[in-house]
């Protein structure tokens, strides 16, 4: 796995040696970012189930200002930190080892707001709608913020109150829906 484009392009990333995580493939990541827009002009990124940190690092590589990368696994957070070091710009990233709910509370208490959020949780279908609702209720999303929800091919994500679906892709065995805050 590697960074595909932007200032960190072609840098290889470490991945987790675990069956519990399924990193987003370079092909899916490339298609996803191509559909969002190749490059960005600032903004804040949140990845609540960061795994290796690849999506948040890719977003910063392509022009976002900073990313908060969250994972409950200590092993995942070690991998994320090693990948962040590869950027040589560690100050643009924050790694939180905690649950999604704890991260939301911490970030709300700090008054953080995000422009791009990645959601690829285990047990995706049940959790994504709840988390999107919490992000909205806790005022963590800027106006027109994008939420990228990734599931496997068998899960169907519904419409979510407060959001519009702006993109819906099936990329191999991966489904990706992009929601925009209303």
What do these predicted ranges mean?
Residues 1-182:
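Class I S-adenosyl-L-methionine-dependent methyltransferase catalytic core
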């Amino acid at each position: 796995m590697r960074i595909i484009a932007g200032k960190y392009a072609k840098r290889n990333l470490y991945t987790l040696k675990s069956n519990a995580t399924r990193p987003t493939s370079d092909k899916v990541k490339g298609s996803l970012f191509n559909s969002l827009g190749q490059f960005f002009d600032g903004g804040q990124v949140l990845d609540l189930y960061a795994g290796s940190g690849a999506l948040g690092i890719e977003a910063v590589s392509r022009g976002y200002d900073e990313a908060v990368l969250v994972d409950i696994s200590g092993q995942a957070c070690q991998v994320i930190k090693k990948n962040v070091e590869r950027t040589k710009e560690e100050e643009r990233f924050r790694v939180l080892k905690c649950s999604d709910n704890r991260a939301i509370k911490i970030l709300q208490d700090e008054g953080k707001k995000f422009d791009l959020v990645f959601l690829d949780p285990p047990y995706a279908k049940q959790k994504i709608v709840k988390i999107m609702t919490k992000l909205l209720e806790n005022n963590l999303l800027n106006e027109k913020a994008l939420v990228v929800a990734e599931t496997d091919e068998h899960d169907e994500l519904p419409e979510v109150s407060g959001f519009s679906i702006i993109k819906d892709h099936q990329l191999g065995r991966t489904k990706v829906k992009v929601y925009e805050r209303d």
